[in-house]
Structure formats: structure tokens, C-alpha cells
Amino acid sequence: METEQQQRKDSVASAGSTRQLLAQMDVKATGSPSAMTSPGAASPATAQSAEDASPAVPYGGKFDPKAIAKKASARHQSPTVLGALQGRAAEKTAVSIAAPAKGSAASSLPQGKPISGFGFGKASNDDKVPTKRKLNLDDEEISKRKLAKLPDLSLETTDDAPYVNQDDDEDSDGDNFAGTEEEAAAAARAAHERREERILQQSMAMETDEANPAAEGQVNGSEPAVSSANAPEEAQAKPQTDSMDVDTKEDDDEVDPLDAFMADLTEPSFGPASKPVKTLSSAKVLPTPEAYFSDDDEFGASTKEGVDAKAIMAMAAKRKKKEIPTIDYSKLDIVPVRKNFWVEPYELSEMTEAEVAELRLELDGIKVSGKDVPKPVQKWSLCGLTRPILDVIAKLEYDKPTAIQMQALPVIMSGRDVVGVAKTGSGKTMAFLLPMFRHIKDQEPVKDNEGPIGLILTPTRELAVQIFRDCKPFLKTLGLRAVCAYGGPPIKDQIADLKRGAEIVVATTGRMIDLLAANQGRVVSLRRTTYIVLDEADRMFDMGFEPQVMKIFANVRPDRQTVLFSATMPKIMDALVKKVLKNPVEIEVGGKSVVASEITQIVEIRDEKSKFNRLLELLGELYKDDDDVRSLIFVERQEKADELLRELLRKGYGCMSLHGGKDQVDRDSTISDFKSGVCPVMIATSVAARGLDVKQLKLVVNYDAPNHLEDYVHRAGRTGRAGNTGTAVTFVTEEQENCAIGIAKALEQSGQPVPEKLIEMRKAFREKVKAGKAKDQSGFGGKGLEKLDKEREAARNRERKTHKAEGEEDDAEDDKKTTKNDEKTDKASSAILGAASAIVSRDAAKAEAEAKAAEGGSTPTAAATPAAGGKGGALDKAASAINEINARLARAGQLRPGQPIDNKGPDAGAFHATLEINDFPQKARWAVTNRTNVAKILEATGTSITTKGNYYPPGKDPPAGADPKLYILIEGDTELVVGNALSELTRLLKEGTMAAADAESRAPASGRYTIT
């Protein structure tokens, strides 16, 4: 029997590797002993014959090696297609149960060895490589399949393969299939795809190694087995179904077994690769690459490049214009608000018209115009105010209303629009604050992010702060919130206060525009604003703020109540009043533009040299009798204020200066120190002429005379407030004839004597005006924000730097556009486009130059000449200059200014380009020639960048025989690197040009005030 068995084995061996391959595949398909053993065991431990191995079978069934060998011989004589299995289920079960016992006793594989995709990790690996199951190369799957109910299988096919494999491969490892070189190559191709998966499978394999033997022991009963009996039904049936599908397909199509096996081996490579593809397909689509340098479009010549350059230059030459979104209230459902709170008291209803007229005459000559004007009140209790407001008034010790308050309070409380004109220090602020509090308390509370109900606009920051301080005593009692917004401090803090909600906003016009334009109008909303006050309205329009004021009014509800107050109201204001007010009531107390009678006015005609000594004399007389008094000195210009400050400090007077050139923090601290008496003397420009209320202020000196009446009235009105007395001294030089008209008129209206010399100066100036030699000045010459931009820019730059250092956001800027800036933008854009030449190949340039030379044109060096501003005439001049230089020097191979681009030096490249920088600003030239920027470009592109030519002033052409204009030569081996370098240099040139244009438009504050 042994001889017969040996012959059968030899016949199988002679069949070649293909037979072995088919046999091994059948072993895996029918459940070999190695497939049934533990993953930690080898297949057979020793090379034994079938007879020696049979007694070790633990079950009671009969094991006949002869029958198995006979069936194996019949199978090898007539081989079948892979998967064509026939037999009986009973015999298959017997053999499959017998094999595990043999293998389990000979387990020699280390337990701690990491298991690959063919081991315990196969369960998770099958999810990624489903085609592995079709090849039946996994031991665990077959062990699962033996527990399922199987169809009828051929006993011949099932039993012959294990013994052929056992006899041939005594040292085969049960965990790894002993295949051919083709299988090893296929496994190697798939190895790198499973490398990352094996790391994750190691932990899973160890857990499975501990769980599966215990589960298998429940099936065998006597000794532990490997296959899991508790596997889910789907996990057991699916490998079987997949295997059967493969078998059926191969059986039907009659595919060669080796081809089918090799095809299945290559399939797993698509399994793992499919997952990354799926991930990429579900990922976010990346932006499409854009070609910056293509063959179809030369650098600097495209229309798109031109548009971009213009846009960039436009941003530098003109700052972005603030646009306030306009609200169409006709399409909104506006909730009506109550504005009329006036109920005429019984005491007033009994008064006749004659008695009312007499009362108004007694109250400083109140003049009113309008229909149905309420009668003036004489007590706080008759004004219709709430009890909390009256309690605060009592705490502030306001005994009775002033003249303007007596008439303005009942008119405003009735919901009418009002124009109030009263002398300085007459209590105009309380005249519009008290009705505003009553107006706000009648409405629903303001929620977060809702706009204010009351809006107060002022022309200066100091006046805004003054009004805000007057509001504070009422805010806590009434439960209201107020925000003071003005330029200088960071806008971020003011926006945060507004978002928390505020019923009252006191703001300057420019900062209010900034807030309304911020974040496309979503920061501040004026939809709930129904009460607007313009304090010192004439000065606001005088400074040119009419467009800004009209923008603000366009965003407020049409049913608003508007109040205008000022100490002066020129006739030119009448037309502007009609634009913003509806049927207003005009109230005039003491006349328009009149200095209070409590103020003593002194006008002195003297030369410039004697002013300072006279000032020292006035200060000495003032502080001789009383130390706790204040004096205010007005000058015309900022530098004059600083100069006078130094002179007074040298004389021992503690003083401070106040003007628009100072930071807002300094301005606030100066006013605070002046009011508290730290510095009893303050030198200021007209910025302090309005809204400044200091009780101890006894002396006002106009060191430089004001040039119009309204300014004089407000300057003098800083003293003699609230019934107190004061003195206003004005110095007028003989050259200031234009100031004589306003000062003389103010003296006449207030009943003060007018000096004869001043009358003569006024007469002389009027004659000059009639003769056309002079122009009368009456105020309203301001240019608005456009004029103030340049004057404030230096201070804003300092503030911006301070905010950046403190982590603050940049302060919002007023954006305006001028025609001059537009012209600069167009010129700079065209210059940048024309300065960059196209990228030219060295060979092409030489060929073109030789062709021109053959035609009798220019020399070969002319082709290498940089373009001079993109003009042919300049190009010819540069070419002729280069030719003359080369002819004179007669030396080759030396790099020098004007040398042709197609040189043979070490830096010569196959491609080159030029960029002329001679006519650009100094900042732009420095940006493209400084060592740091050039080194970065050289490192990034690997090109050669050389600065050539000489600098010539704008408008001057190089003389004959001289070097060409300053330009940059870029050389490189490829067109791409030259284009990249040229693009980077052009970007730097644009940035430098933008910085220069922006610096030019931001001139210092008219040379008035600088910090050194």
C-alpha cells in the first residue's frame, strides 16, 4: 500500500506547480486540517503516514486512508474545474471534524505573534477586502463555515487535498498558505495597502485569540477548539455564499483555474484603494488652479491685469467712501409714538394775550414765531415733568427756569419742532434735555442692539462731553443709559456700549457717520429715534457738515421731533432749517448773535509786539485779588497756542494749551485740570469757544481777534454765565481790518461803547470791499470733512499707532475721493503696466536683433534694451545710448550699466525680462531694490536680478551717450521662474507706489502742529 501511495504522490508532483496550486485551493475550499486548527498552530506537526495519524482521532467514526487515497487518485486522473464539488454531507462532516483534533495537538505557532490578514484579523480585514473570502484563503472563515448547514459536497474533492498537501509540505505553516511565486508577488503588491490596517488589527487579533478558543470549546465538549460557535448567523452564511458564488461562476464560464485564481489575487488591490477614492470624492472641492503665466497672455499686457492694478491704486489714492444704508420707512410698519405731553395749567389758561406779550417782554424780550405757540411757564411744576425729574432738578438747586427754558419747555413738550436762539450761558442744554427724558420714558424700554430714542449731535468733542455730563444726574434716577461717541477714542468701545443698549446718544457728526456706516449699518439703527437735537447747529453747518447731517436725518423716522439750539443763528441758516424741520416754532431770547449784558467787553487796538506785555498785565491784575479764578486765552492757530504756552510758563504762570492737534486724551485732561483749578490759565483755539462751561471763568482774552461775529460772541460767552459777571478783552492789530466789522457790530448790539479807531478800521475795510480789493467774511466757509481730513490725519496716525500697541482696533476713518487722486491713480496704473516688459527668450531676442541689423536697422544690442515707459521714442533713445557706450568702451564680457541683455556672463539666462523703475516714487524704487526683498525673490525663483541704468529726474531723458534710465533686469533658465520673479517685483512696486500716493495725500495738519 505504501508503494501505491508513493506512486500516486509522484504522479501528482509530475503534474507541475499548477496541480499543486489547484490542490492547495481545494484544501482551502473543503476545510483542511490546517484551516481547522488554532491560528497559533501549524498544520501537521510531523510528517506521518495516514495510518499513523488515524489512531489519534478523538471521535468514534471510522477513518479509512485507503478510501481517501483512492478517491484522491480518481480526482487527479480526471481533474475538475475549481469549485465543481460533489459528495455527501455526512462524509464531509466526518472529515471536517476529524481534522481539528489532529492539528490542535500539534500547535507550535507562538501565541504572541502578530496575526496578519490571514489570521484573527481577517474578520475586520474582510470588510475592506471582500474578494479574499471568495478565494477561501482564511482559516477562520472556514472554521465558521463548518458550523453552518452545508449543501451536499463531493467526498472525493473534500478528502484528497489535505493528504497531498500533508505529504508534500511537512514544514508548512498553518497560518500562511504555501503558494507559488505568483502568489508571493501578488501578496507583496497588496502588502503595502494593508500595512496601516495591520497596526489596528493587532489589538483585535489578541482579543479574538482569547475569545475564540473558549467559544469553540463549547462545541467540541472535551477539548478547546478554535472556531467560534457564537458567531452571528450572517457572518457564517456570508463567506459561504460568497464562496458558492465564485464556484458557480467559474463552473458556468469554464474559466481556467489558474487564471481565475490569479485574477482573484489582484482584486484585493482595488478594495483598499476604493476607500481613499471615496473619501476624496466626498471631500470639499478644491479651487480650480489659475494660470498666471501662459503662452496666450504675456505678463502685464492683459486687460485683467490692468483692471487689478487700477483697483489697487484706487484703494491707495482714495480711501473707501462711507456709505450709509438708507431706510425706506414707507415700507415699514412704524409704531406711532406720543410726542405731545403738554397740558396747559390753569394759571396759564387765565392769562390774556396782552399779559403773555408783556411777560415775554420782561423775560429778556422773548420773540416767538409760529402758530399756536404755548405760553411761557415760570415754575418747574408747570412744565409737565415727572416727579423723578423734578426731584433731580431740586437736588441740582435750579430755583426757576431761565428765559429760554420758560418758553422752550412748553413748546418742546407739545411735540413741536423748535429753533431756539439764546445768549451763551442761558441754560439751553436743560431746555432740550428735560423734554427728552419725558419723551423717552413714555416709550417701551430699549432692548439690546436697538438704536437710541434720543440723539444729540454736536460740532465739537468738548461740547459732546459737556452735554453728556449734564445728563448723568438724571440717568440713574430715571433708569436710562447714555453713550457719548466722539472721534479720538477707539470706536470699538463705543460700539460695545451701543450694542448693550442706550436710550440716549450724544455724538459728534463725524463719529455718528462712522457708527452708522460700520458693518453696513448693522451696528447702530435709528429706527427708534424720534427725538433729535442739533446743539450749536449754526457751527455745525458752518464747518461744512450739512451733507453728513442730511445723511443722518435720512435714516431717522419721518415723524421725528427735531430741536435746534444755538447762541447765534445767521440768516443763511433759514434755508437749512426748512430742510430738516416741519413747521417749527422759532424762539429768540435777547436777540440773535448778542453778547450777554453781564459781560464787560474791552477792545484794544495795538501792535503785535505789545500784546504779550498787555496780557501779563491783565493776568497780574486778575490774580492779585483772587487766586481761585480762571482765565481763557484764544488764539487763531495751533502753533501760536504752543508758542504762547512756552512764554507764559517762563513767566511763572501755570497754564495748558487746547487745540485740535492734540490727542483726545490730552484734550479731556486739559479741560478737567482747567475746571478743577490745577492750571488756572488755558490757551485755546476756537475749538473751546462753544460748550465750555466753567463757573470761575472771569477773564477771556482774544489774543488773536476772531474774523466773524458768531465766533466773537461765543468766545466772549465763555465768561459771565448763569448770571455771573465777566470780562472779555480783544486785541486787534491795525492790519486786521476784516475783523473790525464783526467786533464793532457785537459791541453795538450789546450796548457797549465802540472805540473810534475800530470804527475807522471798519469803514476802511468796507471801502476795500466795494472797490473789490477785499472780500467780506461772514463765516460758513468750512469745507466739511474733506477739509478736515488733512488737518486731522497726523493726529489720527498717532492715535492709530497707539491703539495698535494696546491691541485696539484701528479707528474708523472718514473716506473721501478727489479728482486729483483719481488722476494719480490712472497714471500710476498705466505706468506699472508699461514698465514691465514681456518675457523674451535669449535666442529669440538675438534672432530678432540680427534680422533688424540685416535690414540696416538697429544693432543687436537694441533688442535687449529695456522698455522706457512703453514708448517707442524712449526705446530708440535708450538703444542708441547703449550702442554708443559699447562702441566707446569696446570691451566684451564685462557687466556694466547699459550692457546688452543677451550677454554671456555667468548670470545670463535663457529668458529675460525688464522692469523700469526710474519714474516711480522713491518708496516704490526702494521696495524693489532693497536687499531683503531681492534676496527672498532670488531664493524663491533662482533667477538673477540686476539693477542697471542711472536715475534721472522725472521728465528728463538720458542724454546722448549716457546710461539708460534706472531699470531691473531679470534673467532665468525658464520662462516660468522669470515670470514669477517679475510678478513678485511688480507686486512690490505696486505696494510702494500705493504707500507713496497715500503718504502724499496725507499731508501734515497744515504745518500747524507736529510732534518731534
From Swiss-Prot:
Family: Belongs to the DEAD box helicase family. DDX46/PRP5 subfamily.
Region (Disordered): 1-84, 99-252, 770-829, 851-874
Any one of the GO CC terms: nucleus
Segments of skewed composition (Acidic residues): 166-184
Basic and acidic residues bias (residue ranges): 1-11, 190-199, 784-797, 814-827
Catalytic activity field: ATP + H2O = ADP + phosphate + H(+)
Motif (Q motif): 378-406
Keywords tagged on the record: ATP-binding, Helicase, Hydrolase, mRNA processing, mRNA splicing, Nucleotide-binding, Nucleus
Compartments, as annotated in UniProt: Nucleus
GO MF annotations, alphabetized: ATP binding; ATP hydrolysis activity; nucleic acid binding; RNA helicase activity
Record-listed ATP binding positions: A422, K423, T424, G425, S426, G427, K428, T429
Note on domains (UniProt): The Q motif is unique to and characteristic of the DEAD box family of RNA helicases and controls ATP binding and hydrolysis.
UniProt organism field: Pyricularia oryzae (strain 70-15 / ATCC MYA-4617 / FGSC 8958) (Rice blast fungus)
One GO-annotated biological process of the protein: RNA splicing
Domain Helicase C-terminal: 614-762
Highest taxon, organism lineage: Eukaryota
Protein name according to UniProt: Pre-mRNA-processing ATP-dependent RNA helicase PRP5
Compositional bias of kind Polar residues: 219-230
Keyword Chaperone belongs to the record: no
DEAD box (motif): residue ranges: 535-538
Function: ATP-dependent RNA helicase involved spliceosome assembly and in nuclear splicing. Catalyzes an ATP-dependent conformational change of U2 snRNP. Bridges U1 and U2 snRNPs and enables stable U2 snRNP association with intron RNA.
InterPro entries, alphabetized: DEAD/DEAH_box_helicase_dom, Helicase_ATP-bd, Helicase_C-like, P-loop_NTPase, PRP5/DDX46/KHDC4_KH, RNA-helicase_DEAD-box_CS, RNA_helicase_DEAD_Q_motif
